[in-house]
Amino acid sequence: CARFKENWNFVSTPYWQLHIALKKDYVHRQFFHPEDFRDKNGAEAAYRRITSDSVVTINKVERKTVFQQAPLLYDLTALQKDCNIHHDLSADKTLSIAQSLYEKKLVSYPRTGSRYIPEDVMAHVPALLEKVITMPWFREYGRTFDLSGLNTRSVDATKVTDHHALIVTGVVPEGLSEAEAVVYEMIAGRMLEAFSPRCEKESLKMECVCEGMDFRSQSAVIVNPGWRAVFSRKEDREKDEPEGNGGTAVFAEGEEIPVMGYGLAQKKTLPRPLYTEATLLTAMENCGKEIADGQAREAVKELGIGTP
């Protein structure tokens, strides 16, 4: 109710983003002013400082290897969130289907709040994954999947509660309904993701100065997709992997480059979105984070509201 009122009463305000475009070897890259302009006059004054004769100096180029960790195995809430995001299944529907798969002995107990398995269960995982990679959904990924060096991030007996994380049992799925097949694929696919290598990326940050103003560009290129190759979803993209085409040109520190183009884009602030089932489940898990009183926030930090 509070989020709905906040969204309904939100008053949008304009702001402006200034960018320049540089070109090298037939490819370009956009650089953005690090601060948004809240004042139109200030934004237009900054824009007018740049001309077609402007030249920028590249003053910083930083490359580093970064890793995106494989996700943990599913507990019930995480499964419900992903089924809602990717397949528009409600939390109740996902639970009902997961329970049906459990009763058919295809998956472990679904009403679990843990995303980990103990070492004795891990001993059976290679054999289970060997069956998973023969399934039609994962056959292509399975051709290069290495069963000898599994990621053990989801293995921790101290974080297992009454029941361990959701995994498949190795029983061959037959005669599943369309919805059952979807949820089974999610659970089996998450097993593959969880035990796959990290996603390796090369991060590139560049900074330049144009007419006395700082501009920055940040991007990342996937070197080895690791776990992200299981489903190859765009939703797995991180903030350093922009959706738009910011360009691929790379410059050297100290280079002086003429400005190819520049622009000033007007945008507007947006309210926090209304809850979906997936985001509501996240809010239930993290119910203490938005409590203003620090002592009260710490008191409920690890509680959550419970498993749906």
Question: Which residue ranges define each predicted feature?
Answer:
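Phosphate-backbone binding and catalysis cores of DNA-processing enzymes
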Residues: 1-63, 160-225
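Generic, well-ordered alpha-helical scaffold segments in large soluble proteins
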Residues: 3, 49, 82-86, 97-100, ...
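A glycine-rich phosphate-binding loop feature that marks nucleotide/adenosyl-phosphate handling sites
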Residues: 14-24, 100, 118-122, 142-153, ...
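Extended, highly charged linker/hinge segments and catalytic-adjacent loops that couple domains
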Residues: 18, 32, 38-41, 97, ...
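Short acidic, hydrophobic short linear motifs in intrinsically disordered regions
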Residues: 58-62, 69-83, 108-112, 271-286, ...
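Conserved phosphate/pyrophosphate-binding and hydrolysis machinery centered on Walker-type P-loop NTPases
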Residues: 65-73, 87, 91, 115-119, ...
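Short amphipathic alpha-helical interaction segments
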Residues: 88-103, 293, 302-308
